[in-house]
Structures are given as C-alpha cells and as structure tokens.
Amino acid sequence: MDIMKDKIRQALSELDILATEVQIDQWLDYLKLLEKWNKVYNMTAIKNIDEMLVKHLFDSLAVAKYIKGDSTVDVGTGGGLPGVVLAILYPQHQFTLVDSVGKKIMFLKNVKKSLSLNNINPLNTRIENLEGNFDNIISRAFSSVDTFYELCKHFLTEHNQMLAMKGRDLEERNLESLPLNIEKYSIKVPFLNAERNLIVIRKKL
C-alpha cells in the first residue's frame, strides 16, 4: 500500500495538485471498494487496483484544473468516474452523479456512506430527465461528443461549460456548425502511455 501511496504522490506532483494524506487514503479506500464490488457487479472492465490507479484515478485527476465554480453533474458516472475522485479532491464542491444503471448508483451510495462524502449526490435516472443548474457538465467515456451535447444541451448556459473526456477518437463532427466555443486540450495522465483529450464546450457570448 505504501508503494501505491508513493505512486499517487508522484502523480499529484506531476499534475501540480495539492492533496492531504487523508485524501490519498480516501482515494485508495474508494478504489478498494470499486475492486470489491467489481467482482460481483461488473462495475468496470478494469479488474485490478493497480491498473485502476492509473486508468481511473490518475485519468480523473488529470482534468481537475478545468473544473470551475461550485457544482458539477457527472453524466453516465458508472462507478463514480470522474465524480467521486474529484469530490474527494474538492470537498466544498457539489457533485451530482447520474447513471441509469441501478447497481452503479447503489454502489455510489455505499461509497458516500463509507467515505463520508457528503458532497456527492448519486441519482438513478437518465440525464435527459434531470433538471438543474450546474457550473460543469462532465462525461468520461460516456458517448460521442455529439451525443453528449445533444443529451445535455438543456443544461448549457452562457455561464457554464461542458467537458467531454475522450481518448483518440474525438467524434465531434456535428458541433462545428453550432454557435459554440469548442476548445480541445491534450491531457497528460501520469504513468499512462495513451492519448487523452478534453473537449470543453461553451456557448458563444
């Protein structure tokens, strides 16, 4: 476990993120819960905690600096990625975690109770049925960027942003004709030799 903690500290340093030992312990406790539940409920295709450390934890932390304001909705959150990871980092920030699969929300309610994460609100619903105002609308491996925008555009205002975490295939062909400001950032994930991108969508003022 000390080796994993050292790896987390190194990743935090590379990402220029300040975190406490308590937060590091919370991230590890979360990954242990994810690994445990995954054996029964198939929460994620990644089975072992060492791989989860890089492909889930560090991948989620790599977008932390792009989170603005006080509230975020995590669309198709699955096992809580990136929402739970970011909620541990930003305890004053409210995260609404949305997924249509009941077992995943059941898991996240267990995470909330086990880790005393009072700033997450897991909801078993479809994103198109959700109402509310959020500073960030984020998704990770949820769908194409086009589909993400179509399902979530009712949240987008002049004052917030949508963030799509993607791999190599960006698939945002249909957005270019819309009155949107679209920015693409190349994301470096510590210990991961793979292309990662972040698409940030805002309304044109």
UniProtKB/Swiss-Prot annotation:
Residues holding S-adenosyl-L-methionine: G76, L81, I127, E128, R140
UniProt-annotated location(s): Cytoplasm
Catalysed reactions, semicolon-separated: guanosine(527) in 16S rRNA + S-adenosyl-L-methionine = N(7)-methylguanosine(527) in 16S rRNA + S-adenosyl-L-homocysteine
EC number(s) from the headed UniProt entry: 2.1.1.170
Its biological purpose: Specifically methylates the N7 position of guanine in position 527 of 16S rRNA.
Protein name in the entry: Ribosomal RNA small subunit methyltransferase G
Keyword NAD: no
Protein origin, superkingdom: Bacteria
Family statement: Belongs to the methyltransferase superfamily. RNA methyltransferase RsmG family.
Protein's organism: Francisella tularensis subsp. tularensis (strain SCHU S4 / Schu 4)
Cellular component GO terms held in the UniProt record: cytosol
Alphabetically ordered keywords of this record: Cytoplasm, Methyltransferase, rRNA processing, S-adenosyl-L-methionine, Transferase
GO MF term list: rRNA (guanine-N7-)-methyltransferase activity
SUPFAM superfamilies cross-referenced by the UniProt entry: S-adenosyl-L-methionine-dependent methyltransferases
InterPro entries listed in its UniProt record: rRNA_ssu_MeTfrase_G (IPR003682), SAM-dependent_MTases_sf (IPR029063)
